[in-house]
C-alpha cells in the first residue's frame, strides 16, 4: 500500500502523478468523457482484467478526496470494459447502462491509485449482469453492480472490443 500524497504535494495533472503500478497500460478512448476524466489503465490477470486510475486534483471534492461521482463513473466504465474482455457476446458492441448501484465503503485520497476488478454474474441474450470491487491503495472504497444491455455493433474497430497487450 502506498501512502497518499500530503496536501503540500498536490497532484494536479497526470504529469505530476506517480506512475501506474507495474503491468498497467494506459488506454485511450478518443475524445469525450473518458478522455477528460482519464486516462484509465488496464492490466490482464488470470481472472480477467483490472482497470485503474490515479486520483488527481480534478477528480476530488472540496475535502481533497475522490468525488463520489468520479467513483460512480469509474464503476460505470469498469463493468462494461470487463464485459468486453470476458464475454465474446459483448465484443464490439455498445453496452448501455440499464442500472448501476454503488456502495461507498471508504475514501480515495488525492494521489491514491484506484483500481477495480469485476465479474460477470449472469449473461442473457440481451443483458449482462455484473459486479465489481473498487480499491484505493489496497483499501476497499466501493462495491458496484450493474446491468448492461447488449447493444448494437460499433462501426469499425472499437478500443473496448478487446484488451490489446501493449
Residue ranges and their predicted role:
Residues 1-166:
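Terminal targeting signals and extreme-terminal segments of soluble enzymes
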Amino acid at each position: 500500500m502506498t501512502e497518499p500524497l500530503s496536501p503540500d504535494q498536490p497532484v494536479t495533472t497526470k504529469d505530476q502523478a506517480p506512475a501506474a503500478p507495474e503491468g498497467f497500460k494506459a488506454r485511450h478512448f478518443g475524445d469525450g468523457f473518458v478522455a477528460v476524466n482519464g486516462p484509465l489503465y488496464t492490466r490482464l490477470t488470470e481472472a480477467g482484467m483490472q482497470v485503474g486510475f490515479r486520483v488527481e486534483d480534478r477528480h476530488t471534492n472540496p475535502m481533497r478526496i475522490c468525488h463520489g461521482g468520479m467513483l460512480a463513473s469509474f464503476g460505470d466504465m469498469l463493468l462494461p470494459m470487463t464485459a468486453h474482455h470476458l464475454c465474446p457476446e459483448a465484443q464490439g458492441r455498445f453496452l448501455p447502462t440499464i442500472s448501476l448501484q454503488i456502495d461507498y465503503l471508504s475514501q480515495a485520497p488525492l494521489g491514491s491509485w484506484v483500481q477495480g476488478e469485476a465479474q460477470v454474474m449472469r449473461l442473457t441474450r440481451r443483458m449482462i449482469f455484473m459486479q465489481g470491487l473498487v480499491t484505493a491503495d489496497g483499501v476497499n472504497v466501493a462495491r458496484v453492480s450493474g446491468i448492461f444491455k447488449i447493444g448494437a455493433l460499433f462501426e469499425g474497430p472499437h478500443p473496448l472490443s478487446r484488451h490489446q497487450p501493449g
